[in-house]
Amino acid sequence: AGYIDIVEANIFDEKKIRALFKEADICINLIGILFEKKRGNTFKNIHSILPSLLAKLCKEYNLKHFIHVSALGINDAIDSEYAKSKLEGEANVLKNFPLATILRPSVVYSVDDNFTTNFMTLINRLPVFPIYYEGKTKFAPIHCSDLTDTIYHVISKNIYSKIIECTGPEILTFKELLEKLQILIGKKRRS
């Protein structure tokens, strides 16, 4: 049995990242963004360049495993800069550390997460909520504890060189997801 060491670090500080690898056996990359906000926090930097660096360091420091968390559905959304950067990141990871396991989760949710909280806030405040593509986009949300169970399984069963899609038990359209959130916050749906 091992332990998890949580350290705050600037992901653009390669010297600091290298220091973390000296004591590591496994690297799990959970870093990702949904929107480009700040200088430096671009899809390319976060989803492509950083995973490439981490994979190279895994190889250089002879880590046992690299688990890279990507995103589900990116093969079908190639017109999206987000998806392109995720696919590029996956390719870079596998090129630099072929034994890596890539996890592609659907929307990950938990108590007080950004995704759920942001949508609940918007639903509560807006008189009308815009739904694109008639709300038919499908999701299979996965709870964060189920995703961590998957990560544990990958490590404990020595699963290498695989791409694993991670979904929850229920497939919902975006409209159904919003309706569930409305029920949670007690907001009645307008007819």
Say what each PLM segment does.
Residues G2-E60, L72-D76:
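NAD(P)H-binding glycine-rich loop region in Rossmannoid oxidoreductase-like domains
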Residues S70, A91-D112, T117, T121, ...:
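Conserved beta-loop-beta element that borders a ligand/cofactor-binding pocket
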Residues T121-I142, D146, T150-T167:
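A conserved pocket-lining segment of Rossmann-fold NAD(P)-dependent short-chain dehydrogenase/reductase
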Residues V154-S191:
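Mid/C-terminal beta-alpha module of Rossmann-like enzyme folds, strongest
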